Structures are given as structure tokens and as C-alpha cells.
Amino acid sequence: SSVEVIDELYKSETATNFNNKSIAWLLKNYSRIYDDPDMALDLYTRQCSIGVTARQLAVAAATIAFDGVNPVTKQTVFKPDLGTRIASMMATVGFYEHTGDWLFNTGLPAKTGVGGGIMGVVPGVMGVAAFAPPLDDAGNSVKAQAALSDIVGRLNLNIFHPRKSILAEQA
């Protein structure tokens, strides 16, 4: 299935992404962006504004959880070592300034999006996703956080808890 840029979201993000613009030019100053920073920022903003369904987001999360193997098509779409790298990045920066609290409370590596989506990864087990506005002060969906937190709790998916998940018990 295809994905498209949500024009309204793209325009909204473009009108308010002053911090990202500053970061792009700072990266250019330190030779970490090798081309036009405004062009790089526009590309980044467009990819942040792509519309997907909850199912598409969950399949993407599961692909990360299964080290690059899409669970629907069974195709390998990226190198296996990238799954761990991506999940680690999600665990450390996926919720912006709320990342530490989120990870402590849920134990779920996750990434939020400005459209109200959140995708979470339980390495080797599953991917999960939820969509729901409104966003909190850090730009994270309030209701999607509650939904994923509930799922993690009910299924014992916290990656820091040594007990088995009920999913593992059913296998």
C-alpha cells in the first residue's frame, strides 16, 4: 500500500519548525550536512508528514522488531543489525523530552509522530501502534500513549521485566 504526504500537516510543520531549521544550519556549520540545509529540512519535514494507517505503522514496527523481516510479506527489507540500532534509538529519543519517563514507565522502545501516531517495538516479539489526537506539550499523542501503556501492561511486554510475556506463554 502506498503512502502520501499530508499537505495540511506538512504546511503546519513547515510554518513552525524553527528549532529544526536552526539545527540544520548548525549541522551544516559542522559539515554534517553536505548539501543545502533548507532542502534537507524540507525533505525531513515531508517524511514527518507522511500519512499511514495504524496497520501500516504496526507492520513497520514489527519489521523493526523482527530485524528487518516484514511479518506480512516475509521479505527482508533492511540489514538485521539495523533493527537493534533503530529500537535503541527509539528507546533513547523516541518521545523527545518525555523519553526517559515513557521508557521507565512502560519499558517499550517507541517513536511518536506529529500526526498523533506512536509505534512501539518489542524486539523479537512484536510491533504495536496507535493513533489518536490530541498531542501533549512535547508533541506526543495523549490517547495513544494511554493505549500502548495499557497494552504493554496487560501483555507484560516491558523489555526490562524478567517475567515472560503472555504472548510467549501462548507460543
Feature annotation, model-predicted:
Residues F18, S22, D35, M39, ...:
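Conserved active-site and cofactor/substrate-binding residues in soluble primary-metabolism enzymes
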Residues F66-A171:
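Structured C-terminal helix/loop/strand segments within mature extracytoplasmic catalytic/sensor domains
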Residues D7-Y10, L27, T45-S49, Q56, ...:
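Solvent-exposed, flexible loop/coil residues
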Residues S1-Q47:
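Active-site-adjacent helix/loop patches that line small-molecule binding or acyl-intermediate pockets
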Residues Y30, D36, Y44-C48, T53-R55, ...:
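Surface-exposed loop/turn and secondary-structure junction residues enriched for glycine/proline
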Residues W25-R32, T63-F66, T92-F95:
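Glycine-rich, acidic and aromatic/proline-enriched surface loops and short helix-turn segments
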